[in-house]
């Protein structure tokens, strides 16, 4: 991010060789407010105009022949099952596919596997009262409202970003995580809301409430894995207690509402996850986590799994150190979010929506700490982490997911930043929150 004048003002990094530090400094100086805003504008126009053209066809198939709403079709089908009290097909893939094709005849040759708890599908029983096209539109608009509402609430917590409302709005609109959330019709929007609520609660020193938000991620547990480990190892007992209470309440509600039979079917389906991976993860180049990185890079699944475990443990250990540091809450929370993306065992591009707070907090931090040695690295890899998820075709061809490399290096720069001492704002240490 640039200085308020639009030109970067930074110190050369002291932990890199001279050539590397100079290169980072030169690149970071190119990232002025004007350039970043222009790039965001061009990206937003390209993404959303192409998407609009793709959808501008009669019927429920887009120009590429895919069902409009993409994954929303699965939630719509499951919601209709819940609405009609017909839950037996939910965790039976052949029966679910047959019901889906009867419900939406144009969805032939599109298949899904139910991998969520039944409580996730309950709200979709309301949308299932609408025709499929209208229901998909309502869900997209709801995701837009959740996303921009969270961005606005978090932007209000970033004083150095206040003069850049236009640039921030364009960056939010063009964010690849948001674009793919809408394009896929997925359910990662509520996860962003929960992380936002957790941050706001921590900022107000209400740890138990923060834990309630984190524990509610049990509906999409892979996104809460890093938070669970970090808060447990950092001995944040109020947060842990809140998380356990929220997770238990959500599962208890599901058990009470849907009954033992459905819950047993759900847990049995979780045990069969390895058999369903070809359906859940058909395109490894769409995954933006360490596990996806190693599986895409290496043809040997056992070795890839071992390397994922090793690198995930390293990231989690560093995340705990970040959280226990005396750095600002926004910097530590950004580290937690990037770690959450890296260590998640299953993370598709639309799940990157949870990084929106991290981009805001880190952008605000580099504007505040313009003389910090880590600013050039943070600025450059913030830019790369924002843009590289769009290069999935390159990942498919090269078998290297460059976004994960960018996230890993960005996480390393955040770790270095947490060791530079507390910043001017949000000085509270973990013990004080």
Report residues per predicted region:
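Membrane-embedded alpha-helical segments of transport systems
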Residues: 219-222, 248-253, 377-378
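Transmembrane beta-strand segments that form the barrel wall of outer-membrane beta-barrel proteins
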Residues: 210-216
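Hydrophobic alpha-helical transmembrane segments of integral membrane proteins
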Residues: 172-173, 217, 224, 354, ...
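Primarily membrane-embedded glycan-assembly and transfer machineries that use lipid-linked glycans
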Residues: 2-209, 231-356, 360-368, 423-433
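Aromatic-enriched
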Residues: 363-433
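Generic structural signal for short, solvent-exposed loop/turn connectors between secondary structure elements
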Residues: 220, 301, 325-329, 391-399
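Long, hydrophobic, well-ordered secondary-structure blocks that form the structural core
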Residues: 147, 217-219, 223, 227-229
């Amino acid at each position: 991010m640039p200085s308020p004048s639009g030109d970067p003002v930074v110190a050369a990094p002291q932990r890199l060789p001279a050539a590397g530090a100079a290169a980072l400094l030169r690149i970071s100086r190119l990232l002025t407010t004007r350039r970043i805003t222009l790039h965001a504008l061009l990206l937003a126009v390209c993404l959303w105009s192409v998407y609009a053209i793709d959808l501008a066809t009669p019927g429920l198939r887009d120009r590429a022949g895919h069902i409009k709403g993409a994954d929303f079709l699965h939630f719509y089908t499951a919601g209709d099952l819940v609405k009609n009290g017909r839950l037996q097909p939910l965790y039976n893939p052949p029966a679910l596919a047959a019901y889906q094709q009867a419900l939406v005849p144009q969805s032939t040759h599109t298949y899904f596997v139910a991998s969520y708890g039944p409580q996730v599908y309950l709200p979709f029983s309301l949308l299932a009262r609408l025709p499929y096209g209208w229901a998909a539109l309502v869900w997209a608009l709801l995701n837009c409202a959740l996303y921009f509402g969270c961005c606005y609430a978090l932007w209000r917590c970033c004083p150095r970003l206040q003069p850049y409302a236009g640039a921030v709005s364009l960056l939010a609109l063009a964010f690849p995580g948001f674009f793919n959330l809408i394009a896929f019709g997925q359910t990662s929007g509520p996860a962003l809301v929960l992380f936002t609520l957790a941050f706001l609660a921590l900022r107000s020193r209400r740890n138990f409430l923060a834990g309630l938000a984190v524990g509610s991620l049990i509906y999409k547990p892979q996104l809460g894995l890093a938070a669970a480990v970090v808060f447990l190892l950092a001995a944040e007992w109020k947060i842990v207690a809140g998380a356990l209470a929220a997770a238990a309440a959500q599962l208890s509600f599901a058990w009470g509402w849907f009954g033992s039979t459905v819950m047993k079917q759900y847990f049995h389906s979780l045990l069969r996850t390895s058999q369903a991976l070809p359906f859940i993860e058909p395109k490894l180049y769409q995954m933006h986590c360490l596990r996806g990185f190693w599986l895409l890079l290496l043809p040997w699944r056992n070795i890839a799994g071992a390397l994922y475990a090793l690198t995930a443990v390293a990231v989690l250990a560093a995340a705990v150190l970040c959280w226990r540091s005396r750095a600002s809450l926004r910097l530590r929370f950004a580290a937690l979010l990037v770690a959450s993306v890296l260590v998640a065992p299953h993370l598709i591009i639309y799940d990157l929506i949870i990084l929106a707070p991290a981009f805001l907090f880190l952008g605000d931090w580099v504007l505040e700490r313009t003389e910090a040695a880590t600013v050039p690295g943070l600025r450059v890899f913030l830019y790369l982490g924002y843009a590289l998820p769009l290069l999935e075709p390159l990942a498919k061809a090269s078998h290297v997911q460059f976004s994960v490399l960018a996230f890993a290096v960005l996480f390393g720069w955040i770790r270095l930043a947490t060791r530079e001492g507390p910043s001017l704002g949000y000085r509270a240490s973990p013990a004080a929150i």
